[in-house]
Structures are given as structure tokens and as C-alpha cells.
């Protein structure tokens, strides 16, 4: 079965039905989890793009906008020339970090069982 990626608004009837579904709707997408992981510390756009190999500028922009809309990320623009924009986690984003850390630990255990190494 082919994998698909959700694009667009989440149907209203799916919101609030299951807290796991609600969480999944926020972090769904190929890149969001790794973007959140790298935002443990405040980063500029170019730094994020370097840290996430294979992501295009447009996709990174769109994923950051979605994370900002879902109140996981704050975009701060400084009135400087050249323009300076930084991204950081909101309290909700910071609250997700223990889950990401647990996922990382699970990934390490899975890698050992699968004979992979990091």
C-alpha cells in the first residue's frame, strides 16, 4: 500500500475524537518531527535547512508555517538589515520534547535489534 501525506485542513469531524489523532494531526508530515527535534535550541532558517538534509526551501517554509499555525513554533522577526528571523519552540513544542526523546531511545533500541547503528 502506498503511503500518502495529508494536505489541507483537517476535517472538523476528526478534531477532538481521539487525543492521539489530534497529536498526529499536528506532527504529521515527513519533516515536522525532525524540525521540532532541531528546534530544541533557537535556530535561523538557514541553520534548519542545513540540519535537515534533503528538505527544500519551500517545504521547510511550509512545514514551519504549519507548526507555527499549530502553536508548536514561534517565528520571531528582528528589524535588522539583512533581515533576521529565528524559530523556537512554544511551550506546547517544549512539552513535546520528552516524547521526541522517548522516540529517540526507542529508535536506538530498534536499531540495535535491527543491526543498525547510529
Show the residue positions of the predicted features.
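Basic, amphipathic "hinge/linker" alpha-helix immediately C-terminal to the N-terminal HTH DNA-binding motif
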Residues: 79-103
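Residues within the DNA-recognition helix of helix-turn-helix
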Residues: 63
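Amphipathic alpha-helical dimerization/coiled-coil segments
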Residues: 2-8, 15, 37, 94-118
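N-terminal helix-turn-helix DNA-binding core of bacterial DNA-binding proteins
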Residues: 14-59, 83-86, 117
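Glycine-centered, phosphate/nucleic-acid-interacting loop/turn motifs that mediate DNA/RNA or nucleotide
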Residues: 71
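Short beta-strand "wing" residues that participate in macromolecule-binding interfaces
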Residues: 75
Amino acid at each position: 500500500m502506498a503511503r500518502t501525506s495529508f494536505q489541507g485542513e483537517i476535517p472538523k469531524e476528526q478534531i477532538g475524537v481521539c487525543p492521539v489523532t489530534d497529536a498526529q494531526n499536528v506532527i504529521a508530515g515527513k519533516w515536522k518531527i525532525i524540525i521540532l527535534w532541531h528546534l530544541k535550541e533557537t535556530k535561523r532558517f538557514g541553520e534548519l535547512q542545513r540540519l535537515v538534509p534533503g528538505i527544500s526551501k519551500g517545504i521547510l517554509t511550509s512545514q514551519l508555517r504549519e507548526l507555527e499555525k499549530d502553536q508548536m513554533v514561534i517565528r520571531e522577526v528582528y528589524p535588522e538589515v539583512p533581515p533576521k528571523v529565528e524559530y523556537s519552540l512554544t511551550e506546547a513544542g517544549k512539552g513535546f520534547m520528552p516524547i521526541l526523546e522517548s522516540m529517540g531511545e526507542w529508535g536506538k533500541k530498534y536499531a540495535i535489534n535491527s543491526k543498525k547503528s547510529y
